[in-house]
Amino acid sequence: MALFPVASEQPISRPAIANLTIIGLNVFMFLLEIILGDSFINSWAFTPAHLTAFFNGTGSFQAVLTIFTAMFMHASFSHIFGNMVFLWVFGQAIENAFGSRPYTTFYLVCGVAANMAQYLIDPNSTVPNLGASGAIAGVMGAYLALYPTSTIDLFVWPLSLFTHRDIRVPAWLMLGLWFAVQVTLGGNGMTEAGAAGGVAYFAHIGGFVTGLVLALLVRPDERRLLSAA
């Protein structure tokens, strides 16, 4: 069984241009991966051991750049498709809350925090990390902080195919359970992105916590409005 968010009830007051641009950049980078192959992926994915080598004075500055480039890369079509669906559903509301430029900065900060969280777990790992999941987890954390009672429509595979309807759940339930799963799997010894099918659980945890905390700090007015509603 697989769950995908397909819609949020949170009203969107203006087009989420930055979010669409980020989605476009992810698609562009994925096309480059297909065209240029493994050499491009290995050069621009984030490998913790390469960053450790840079800190030790034996590596290239490119290792620092990969902290950013890796968050726009993906391992497969299903990987990028799933990530972009989550980003589309949750990113629009967060961009509307923050504004386009602050949202872009917020997204990048969450992505960096996610990669560094994974790095701290195993700084000598030679497994390349790639994917927008950590940055998107930050967007999800912000959504939980700002709109916990908003309703999320979930497509449940294969149930929704037979019932022809989605399941509606409050954001706090869906996002809270999602985070609990990441913590549980991360705590079961998942110390590398290459473990358990290539999922960087600690990147998800780091990104989510960063996004949640930043949203609570930057947008206290949103929380006051929610409390008064």
Model-identified regions with their sequence ranges:
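A detector for small-residue-rich transmembrane helices and their helix-helix packing motifs
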Residues: 1-229
